[in-house]
Amino acid sequence: MNPVISAASVIAAGLAVGLASIGPGIGQGTAAGQAVEGIARQPEAEGKIRGTLLLSLAFMEALTIYGLVVALALLFANPFV
């Protein structure tokens, strides 16, 4: 394998995971903060808010997992070789 392609693939894999986790990380923090605020305002709606929060957190985390899949594909099944 060409060392330049190998080095670029490792850098791209690191960037894929890093950049793919920035947006969901910010979104998860904002969603959790808003959920806590909503529960503080309406404690009787805690179950509904928590269920919606967990579902939305799972969808946000899926974006990070997609970045991990791209990184693993670049490292172990490199299409540029």
UniProtKB/Swiss-Prot annotation:
Gene Ontology MF terms in the entry: lipid binding; proton-transporting ATP synthase activity, rotational mechanism
Site (Reversibly protonated during proton transport) location in chain: 61
InterPro entries referenced in this protein's UniProt entry, alphabetically: ATP_synth_csu_bac/chlpt (IPR005953), ATP_synth_F0_csu (IPR000454), ATP_synth_F0_csu_DDCD_BS (IPR020537), ATP_synth_F0_csu_sf (IPR038662), ATPase_proteolipid_c-like_dom (IPR002379), F/V-ATP_Csub_sf (IPR035921)
Keywords noted in UniProt: ATP synthesis, CF(0), Chloroplast, Hydrogen ion transport, Ion transport, Lipid-binding, Membrane, Plastid, Thylakoid, Transmembrane, Transmembrane helix, Transport
Bilayer disposition of the protein: Multi-pass membrane protein
Membrane-spanning segments: 7-27, 57-77
Pfam families for this protein: ATP-synt_C (PF00137)
CDD domains: ATP-synt_Fo_c_ATPH
Main location group: plastid
UniProt key word Isomerase: no
GO cellular component terms, A-Z: chloroplast thylakoid membrane; proton-transporting ATP synthase complex; proton-transporting two-sector ATPase complex, proton-transporting domain
Compartment(s) where it occurs, according to its Swiss-Prot or TrEMBL record: Plastid, Chloroplast thylakoid membrane
Other information: In plastids the F-type ATPase is also known as CF(1)CF(0).
Family: Belongs to the ATPase C chain family.
UniProt subunit comment: F-type ATPases have 2 components, F(1) - the catalytic core - and F(0) - the membrane proton channel. F(1) has five subunits: alpha(3), beta(3), gamma(1), delta(1), epsilon(1). F(0) has four main subunits: a(1), b(1), b'(1) and c(10-14). The alpha and beta chains form an alternating ring which encloses part of the gamma chain. F(1) is attached to F(0) by a central stalk formed by the gamma and epsilon chains, while a peripheral stalk is formed by the delta, b and b' chains.
Described purpose of this protein according to its UniProt entry: F(1)F(0) ATP synthase produces ATP from ADP in the presence of a proton or sodium gradient. F-type ATPases consist of two structural domains, F(1) containing the extramembraneous catalytic core and F(0) containing the membrane proton channel, linked together by a central stalk and a peripheral stalk. During catalysis, ATP synthesis in the catalytic domain of F(1) is coupled via a rotary mechanism of the central stalk subunits to proton translocation. Key component of the F(0) channel; it plays a direct role in translocation across the membrane. A homomeric c-ring of between 10-14 subunits forms the central stalk rotor element with the F(1) delta and epsilon subunits.
Protein name: ATP synthase subunit c, chloroplastic
Organism the protein comes from: Staurastrum punctulatum (Green alga)
Gene: atpH
